[in-house]
């Protein structure tokens, strides 16, 4: 529907008291992204031309998240919580600027797909003034009911105001609504609060539109997709649903997840073809994995880019700023951070590589540590192509080990090592023949 302008109004003013958290509800994360981020990303993918977000009083943290995701979004404050229609009207200035379609949704509904938003919006192009999204939950208790007559939506009745016959309806209100821009403001302004809670319900838009002789319809979505998150339990349930989606998409794209239920992905994780992910691997935000990569068990990746043919793990941790070029091997109990490791290099055991550049085909022996922090600042380590770092070596940054250089085992390197040189930085071994025998004899003499 690129020929029609779309104003999206996202309601993000809820207190979220059931979350029992100091963090605003909509800033809690699902698959590495805030719920608000998920919703805004879906609306962008659905063709939003303008975005308005309604936040609670003083919620600059929520406003900052909005602007980070959609820099040109308009942010409005709902000073009093008097119902959903009242919240939408907090964005009056955006509504007055006009749009062909207006889409209202909630920032605590992170699982809705762009395709479903398109389905909800479609009736407006066909002439409807209002379209509501419905679903059939396993238990409808607590939900508003969609009262229909044929293809028409007659009313949305909140459960507290529903008759016995209406409570028997299983088709429930998901909360998302689309309104024709030409009628949106007029309808919203006439919504009253004559109901059990004394609030201004957005759902009353249906009956007002029909009273004007306009059409209202209902679209249908899966229950999992429109699940709202109001508690930690529901947050975990949303995580499980989204993780399953992400795992299925990864496998459909050509990645092998040996035990999918033990692999946790972020919403932006990219896995190439013929990637093999063994059990118990966590992908934090910002991870891109090329083709033919093998990730062994118990690895944690975040903010890392892996080119084709890389092997990592088991028990590897890749932190933000890690770049592994093709064919790199990262072994067990290795941690990297802000490190670029070029093609064919190996860091196979028990090492920390931070704020570093490692050249192609270099080999870092077991226990190699880049000492990058002096308590005040971070410093870089440069390791040239083909360099060989002996086991249990400490490279005290800032320092450079040249191409093809060797560093002897157990070294503490504090000065640059030239290309093709050998650096030895440890005390010479001293052997005292018979010393141990004499020591034991002295210790075993009776005390007198």
Swiss-Prot record:
Region (Pyrophosphorylase): 1-232
Main location: cytoplasm
Positions contributing to Mg(2+) binding: 108, 230
Subcellular location(s) per record: Cytoplasm
Record region (Linker): 233-253
Annotated binding of acetyl-CoA, by residue: 366, 372-373, 409, 426
Cofactor(s) demanded: Mg(2+)
Pfam family, one: NTP_transf_3
Pathway(s) served: Nucleotide-sugar biosynthesis; UDP-N-acetyl-alpha-D-glucosamine biosynthesis; N-acetyl-alpha-D-glucosamine 1-phosphate from alpha-D-glucosamine 6-phosphate (route II): step 2/2; Nucleotide-sugar biosynthesis; UDP-N-acetyl-alpha-D-glucosamine biosynthesis; UDP-N-acetyl-alpha-D-glucosamine from N-acetyl-alpha-D-glucosamine 1-phosphate: step 1/1; Bacterial outer membrane biogenesis; LPS lipid A biosynthesis
Cellular component GO terms held in the UniProt record: cytoplasm; membrane
Cofactor note: Binds 1 Mg(2+) ion per subunit.
Catalysed reaction, written as an equation: alpha-D-glucosamine 1-phosphate + acetyl-CoA = N-acetyl-alpha-D-glucosamine 1-phosphate + CoA + H(+); N-acetyl-alpha-D-glucosamine 1-phosphate + UTP + H(+) = UDP-N-acetyl-alpha-D-glucosamine + diphosphate
EC nos: 2.7.7.23, 2.3.1.157
Stretch list, region N-acetyltransferase: 254-448
Any Gene Ontology biological process: regulation of cell shape
Top-level lineage group: Bacteria
Subunit structure: Homotrimer.
UniProt-listed NCBIfam families: glmU, PRK14353.1
Name this protein carries in UniProt: Bifunctional protein GlmU
Higher taxonomy: Bacteria, Pseudomonadati, Pseudomonadota, Alphaproteobacteria, Hyphomicrobiales
